[in-house]
Amino acid sequence: MARDKQYRDNAQKFDRDRLHSDEEAIGIIKSLGMKKFDETVDIVVRLGVDPRKADQMIRGTVALLAGTGKDVRVAVFAQGEAATAAREAGAEFVGADDLAAEIEGGMTDFDVAIATPDMMPTVGKLGRVLGPRSLMPNPKTGTVTPDVVKAINEFKGGMVEYRTDRFANVHVPIGKASFGEDALLTNLRALVGELERVKPAASKGKYVKKLSLIHISEPT
């Protein structure tokens, strides 16, 4: 099958048992056969932290200067002037109780949820829906803020969230397969630099243990 042949061809382009520099890894990713759509390139960073401990949980946002290549859809919980400003800034979904009702009904057709502080009592009731999808607004990621316009512009312009999973991995998209090597490298280094910046004081031993680049072979 053509898919099996492409897999074999790609597997011959690098040594799985050898560690590569970031430049080499980006070059390998760029050399792999592409699908008919523009695949997402993800980075998985294994960190030397214990995510079971509160003082070693890592969560935040980082600006990918080369962008993500994705059309980010934003939902904003706001009222009055803040809601008007959010619509003018290009948010796809804006509302208060009405938006909450839509989400309770199963509407989650957005990538980022932003809320003004006064809307958090309403948003907090949506934890069952938003939490498992990593869409719950949080002050640590800049998604609970009175300045919704700034947040919308940042997330549509390349800001992404990161957090450790239960295995101490951080999994973040850094661009598309169509990006140039310099753009992917810029985004990779921005993320790693941010993770180094927020290294917990309680983390002992080697902090950044392993970086892996992955082609996500599904259209987005």
For each feature predicted by the language model, list its residue ranges:
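Structural signal for hydrophobic packing residues in well-ordered secondary-structure cores
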Residues: 11-14, 18, 29-36, 51, ...
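Long, charge-patterned amphipathic alpha-helical coiled-coil/hairpin "stalk" segments used as oligomerization
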Residues: 91-198
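Ordered, amphipathic secondary-structure segments that act as subunit-interaction surfaces
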Residues: 72-91, 98-99, 122
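Flexible, glycine/charged-enriched surface loops at secondary-structure junctions
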Residues: 37-41, 198-210
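Translation machinery proteins
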Residues: 20-84, 105, 111
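Residue-level detector of conserved catalytic or cofactor/ligand-binding positions
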Residues: 211-220
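Residue-level signature of catalytic and energy-coupling elements of molecular machines
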Residues: 25, 86, 131, 213
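Generic N-terminal amphipathic, Lys/Arg-enriched alpha-helix
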Residues: 2-15, 22-23
